[in-house]
């Protein structure tokens, strides 16, 4: 899958999640590539693009180990429940070394999950992960 198609699928997923949750679930979505000690921002939607890049390692917080370990499979995702502010709430593996970062810059995942509508809002997210399992993102050199 191309980055262009991936970003369209991500935007559609975000729209579905927000509709089911009746408010914005994640106000920040980023597709990144990690290789060795280098990272590249491939796509971004949110309120703080330059700060996202500048503060990436700090904001990765509790998710940093999972992101950098490199042992997750395509389609796998991880959440942290107690990250607040600009700390990332989730990541999903889109392809080899390619990740989706999801963040709510206002609420923690714990606060989001307390709303009963969160259960239904998760469905599009899981469906998105299945799409990447079937067709991972492949970066063109």
Q: What spans do the regions from the language model cover?
A:
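A charged amphipathic helix-loop-strand protein-protein interaction module that recurs
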Residues: 3-16, 42-87
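Short N-terminal helix-loop-first-beta-strand/juxtamembrane motif that initiates sensory/input modules
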Residues: 19-39
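Short glycine-rich, low-complexity/disordered patches
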Residues: 23-30, 74-81, 134-141
